[in-house]
């Protein structure tokens, strides 16, 4: 089957906001973007809340965005599924969760609960900790240790005190549990193979090994702030009562990992579940009774899963592959899982005719130190792919607006936008020269808001702002006044001249004149 070649460019974290103040996108010098916006059909679409399968008031994120874009329909997120399970009561009868609780209770062992403690809603939610404490109390389990990872990335940089206080109140109300350790997500939730970061979290969890200790979580947080650390970067801290010892994981204990987003939970899970793990030396390898994850983190993991993924049939990648067409996914490390695993509806393997290019992200502590990231390298690979004329569909992600936006550094974020703009001009020109068309969009907002006016702190989280869509091609066309991320794949199919599969509920934003 013949199809017009199309290029989808996803500008990660590129939201729309009119005010220039603290807006890296508005303040950046971006002649290519400005020209494309002025001279080509464009619109704004929704990328948060119910339009992408999230609860009301919940900002979008990269996982959710790419799932919805690739599926061509609203994908109800694990966050929403879990919240509904708590409301319906199913959470408290979930077989995987009950198994972990009962194994600990019936054998006099400890249940260790791991996860990101915040209300950010991107990787986890504090209310899931609270619900699990209720479950443990209902089932008569007395030994529950909470190992909390601090956020400061999808939440304000110094907001952990609120979540720790609410958790402490819940512990008192439920009558079970105590905080045994805490560490920043920078260490516990690395996804870029910085294994020494992960080792510090693993050693803390398994043997209570930590650079710092405190009598309470609140005291540990105050000490971290005094050292100049913000939530994301809090170093391993064991919470040890005056008359006690650090908590360790023992043979026969159970673990429940409460993160519902997989990409930043995989690396820390591996040393617990892989017998031949070799990325770092493990001083202790407790033989756990069960390792339960709230959602499916990887098809390769032999673990218990409380909420397994739901199959997404006939997403864009699968549909294009079944038509015998060629496609390419390209991104740097930070967003590679999003244009592959998440875009494909949670499928680990590539579809027939699907090629993938991974460009390594720079090895820096934070991306404000190198706001260009690997955008230029991605662009060179992308230009070569366009020039090869092999592909009917190319999906490319530029990570800069999101990853540099997360640092809260306005000047660096402006540089990130300007870098992407330079790349955008080159690849759009190349795709048009090839006789193809381009659709540019974003998965959620971020870089358009770099300061929280209420708190005066850097704004490092995503936003709920609308995201842009630009159609660039030689045909005359118009775009709908609004829509949502589910409409992106139907729009691409319209551009390619292909029918839309019945499983896609989104609608094409594009009308050719």
UniProtKB/Swiss-Prot annotation:
EC number, UniProt record: 5.4.2.12
The keyword Metal-binding belongs to this UniProt entry's keyword annotation: yes
Any one GO CC term of the record: cytosol
The organism's place on the tree of life at top rank: Bacteria
Pathway(s) the chain acts in: Carbohydrate degradation; glycolysis; pyruvate from D-glyceraldehyde 3-phosphate: step 3/5
Residues reported in the UniProt entry to bind Mn(2+) 2: 12, 62, 443-444
Residues bound to Mn(2+) 1: 402, 406, 462
Name of a matching Pfam family: iPGM_N
Residues at the catalytic site: 62 (phosphoserine intermediate)
Reactions catalysed, as given in the entry: (2R)-2-phosphoglycerate = (2R)-3-phosphoglycerate
Keyword Cell membrane: no
Cofactor(s) listed: Mn(2+)
Biological process, per Gene Ontology: glucose catabolic process; glycolytic process
Keywords assigned by UniProt, alphabetized: Glycolysis, Isomerase, Manganese, Metal-binding
Entry binding sites for substrate: 123, 153-154, 185, 191, 261-264, 335
Coiled-coil region: none
GO molecular function annotation: manganese ion binding; phosphoglycerate mutase activity
UniProt remark on cofactor binding: Binds 2 manganese ions per subunit.
Stored InterPro entries: Alkaline_phosphatase_core_sf, BPG-indep_PGM_N, Metalloenzyme, PGAM_B_sf, Pgm_bpd_ind
PANTHER family: 2,3-BISPHOSPHOGLYCERATE-INDEPENDENT PHOSPHOGLYCERATE MUTASE (PTHR31637:SF0)
Self-association state and partner proteins as the record states: Monomer.
Role summary: Catalyzes the interconversion of 2-phosphoglycerate and 3-phosphoglycerate.
Family label: Belongs to the BPG-independent phosphoglycerate mutase family.
Protein name: 2,3-bisphosphoglycerate-independent phosphoglycerate mutase
Organism whose genome encodes this protein: Thiobacillus denitrificans (strain ATCC 25259 / T1)
Encoding gene (name): gpmI
